[in-house]
Amino acid sequence: MADIQAEKAFQKQQVSFKNRFQLKASKGKEGIRYYKNIGLGYRTPKDAIEGTYIDKKCPFTSDVSIRGAILRGTVISTKMRRTLVVRRNYLHYIKKYNRFEKRHSNIPAHVSPAFNVKEGDSVTIGQCRPLSKTVRFNVIKHDISAASKKQFKAF
């Protein structure tokens, strides 16, 4: 949340929700802050309501809508700015041998400054419009430290 004005141009919150969602505003010392409830049973984080960050790709404070697939996975990389890589492990059935094999997929997702995500944490990501060349998902829920749970590692 320290990168409030990290860009060269002055950043301000865009208010164009087009009446699709219930628009809410909170008045703070910085002025009026707009946020919305994304629905689907997910709550708006407290940092999105009370924070001062400006992110045009945040599902809670901008006009990005969550639609389509909702997935869960483990964070394996946070090296990109406001983007992380989520690993999803799954089993694939091989009919010839009547057995399953372990597979995985890496999904890049945008993370809002409202979440303080570290590697190894479990996150829920929701599909949205394409945000860049490879990013089509947005973090909508953060569960701290999935390392304590039993899971299979990279093979």
Swiss-Prot record:
MF GO annotations: structural constituent of ribosome
Record key words, sorted: Acetylation, Ribonucleoprotein, Ribosomal protein
Annotated Gene Ontology cellular component terms: cytosolic small ribosomal subunit
One Pfam family in the UniProt entry: Ribosomal_S17
InterPro entries: NA-bd_OB-fold (IPR012340), Ribosomal_uS17 (IPR000266), Ribosomal_uS17_arc/euk (IPR028333), Ribosomal_uS17_CS (IPR019979), Ribosomal_uS17_N (IPR032440)
Gene3D superfamilies registered for this protein in UniProt: 2.40.50.1000
Residue positions, PTM N-acetylalanine: A2
GO aspect biological process, one term: translation
PANTHER family per record: 40S RIBOSOMAL PROTEIN S11 FAMILY MEMBER (PTHR10744), 40S RIBOSOMAL PROTEIN S11-RELATED (PTHR10744:SF9)
Family indicated by similarity: Belongs to the universal ribosomal protein uS17 family.
NCBIfam families listed in its UniProt record: uS17_arch
Protein name: Small ribosomal subunit protein uS17
Organism of provenance: Dictyostelium discoideum (Social amoeba)
Lineage: Eukaryota, Amoebozoa, Evosea, Eumycetozoa, Dictyostelia
